Amino acid sequence: MSCMEIEINNQDNNQMVFTVEGADVSLVNALRRICMVEVPTLAIETVEFLKNDARIFDEALAHRLGMVPISTDLESLVLASECDCDDHCPRCSVSLVLKGKGPKTLYSGDLKSEDPNLKPVLDTIPLVKLKEGEEVELEAIAQLGQGKEHAKWQPTTTCAYKNYPQITIDGDKCESCLQCVQECPRNVLEFDEEKNQIKVVDLENCSMCRTCMKDCPNQAINVEIVEDKF
């Protein structure tokens, strides 16, 4: 078996897309599952309510808090299950405080963390709507955990893979009728006026629907998968 290679195509604060070559389906699926359930992240585990006059049960608000994604520093934290403390400590957790009076809506950005580097990833997640005279005050403890324990510790929302496509155009059969270019739903193909031929311009965007193959009158185009590339 050839050596597996991983190439990052694009990456930002919200997503990463990469290409894996020299692997089979079982290995790529294992990598997908590891991304979902093995990578440690912070999530709120316990909530102590000091006051809650809102029209929402403590349990419901605690559940919402648990699903708020929190930025994580794996160099300074250890898994709660591997920590020597009895309950929680700065090595495995961080404390956040939520406090507010109505009328107003409290958002994830209102959670104040004792560590400015460990805070909600997004500030705009609505948590509770307070009416006039209602008040909420609580302390939440976020601990380092893994997705295999609970979904709130999953670092990804969607983690998927697809087979890598390979598109071959037979120049002898192709008459440049542009039928395949017009019918492709993802604009993978384009007509090169200088060379007077069809060319592939966005291969990775191909969903392998094979619409181009079906609509080509001369069967000049072929779409297939690369067995060891995803």
Sequence positions of predicted segments:
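Protein-protein interaction/assembly regions in multi-subunit complexes
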Residues: 1-230
